[in-house]
Amino acid sequence: MERTYLMIKPDGVQRGLVGEIISRFEKKGFKLVGMKFLRLTREMAEKHYAEHVGKPFFAGLVDYIISGPVVAMCWEGKDIVSVSREMMGATNPAKAAPGTIRGTYAVDIGRNIIHGSDSPASAERELAIYFQSDELVEWDRTLQGWLTE
């Protein structure tokens, strides 16, 4: 099964959306295998957003993501990287489809509730920033046979 990294950003935590967001992924049939509630260090944030170093918004992005607690999660499921991206909606909430997480809850591109890995390679890199291998729990979901062939 494929894994991805999802992070509820400080605005999602402050607005009390953690339960709602987790519920959406559980109801879709995805399996939570790791979760942490933490405040990112500047070093973690800079490592996470390394691809944006040198861009005009980099400093503000790092300052924002370390401004409050986040929920770091590892989810598992069939095609989870692409499906979770669809569930989140476009990065810019103004372009996010109604019913997506960002289309429903986000207002501003700089406060867009959630981050999700954009590829399996990104997921692997991002998960390594937040989780040790022994922090991801292998478990059998009894209803898995009802979700996928």
From Swiss-Prot:
Family from the record: Belongs to the NDK family.
Keyword Magnesium: yes
Protein name in the entry: Nucleoside diphosphate kinase
Binding sites annotated in the UniProt record for ATP: 9, 57, 85, 91, 102, 112
Assembly and interaction partners: Homotetramer.
GO cellular component: cytoplasm
Named cofactor requirement(s): Mg(2+)
Single annotated GO MF: metal ion binding
Family matches, as InterPro entries: NDK-like_dom (IPR034907), NDK-like_dom_sf (IPR036850), Nucleoside_diP_kinase (IPR001564), Nucleoside_diP_kinase_AS (IPR023005)
Taxonomy, superkingdom: Bacteria
Chief localisation class: cytoplasm
Catalytic residues (positions): 115
Alphabetical keyword list: ATP-binding, Cytoplasm, Kinase, Magnesium, Metal-binding, Nucleotide metabolism, Nucleotide-binding, Phosphoprotein, Transferase
One Gene Ontology term from the biological process aspect of the record: CTP biosynthetic process
Pfam families reported in the protein's UniProt record: NDK
Coiled-coil stretches: none
EC numbers, comma separated: 2.7.4.6
NCBIfam families: PRK00668.1
Cell location: Cytoplasm
Catalytic activity annotation: a 2'-deoxyribonucleoside 5'-diphosphate + ATP = a 2'-deoxyribonucleoside 5'-triphosphate + ADP; a ribonucleoside 5'-diphosphate + ATP = a ribonucleoside 5'-triphosphate + ADP
Chain's role: Major role in the synthesis of nucleoside triphosphates other than ATP. The ATP gamma phosphate is transferred to the NDP beta phosphate via a ping-pong mechanism, using a phosphorylated active-site intermediate.
Keyword presence, Lipid biosynthesis: no
Taxonomic source organism: Heliobacterium modesticaldum (strain ATCC 51547 / Ice1)
PANTHER family documented for this protein: NUCLEOSIDE DIPHOSPHATE KINASE
Gene: ndk
